[in-house]
């Protein structure tokens, strides 16, 4: 059971608002891009993206934590993300789960998702049919926009790290992280198959942003 009361989030610090908000956005995006067929879940995910990003409620909530309307819409987007990912998640979560499993790093899951998301959007680009056009529409971008670059800009505007290196992930950890990510259940609903070697390359790219 989840109690989804946006008034409980009014005192959440800006950095945590940004990180948890991007966790919700990533849930919605990965659910949309999952190859599993579930049109209702896709529609719910698209609405969550539109609320958080297209309508600017994540940026508004970070700028003013007391903005009750922004908090309500972000709570709705988070709830929609949870409903949408019944369709499956993807390689962003596989990679963030692997990083989060290293307790010595003490890395925040939502921040990891935000930082890794652009790398996976680049990786999946040619394997999602027309879904990037739908994603751009929900985000309030032109159809020709690059959603990966849009997320990089959003992360910067939210004050989140630009890459995994800034979060303390070391290059010598890549082999173990890649093995963990390749075994993660979310890998199986990524629109593009990803091998251990793919994950090694993806971590290398995410380290530098």
Segments from the language model and where they lie:
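Short alpha-helical scaffolding segments that buttress acidic/His motifs in well-ordered protein cores
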Residues: 25-29, 74-82, 95, 117, ...
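Short, amphipathic C-terminal "tail helix"
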Residues: 171-209
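Gly/Pro-rich interdomain helix-loop hinge
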Residues: 101-173
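Catalytic-loop motifs flanking and including active-site residues across diverse enzymes
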Residues: 17, 21-24, 44, 48, ...
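Glycine-rich phosphate/pyrophosphate-binding beta-alpha loops
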Residues: 79-113, 184-189
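Glycine-rich phosphate/diphosphate-binding loops and the adjacent beta-loop-alpha structural elements
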Residues: 31-87, 97-101
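A glycine/threonine-rich phosphate-anchoring loop and its flanking beta-alpha core
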Residues: 1-37, 134
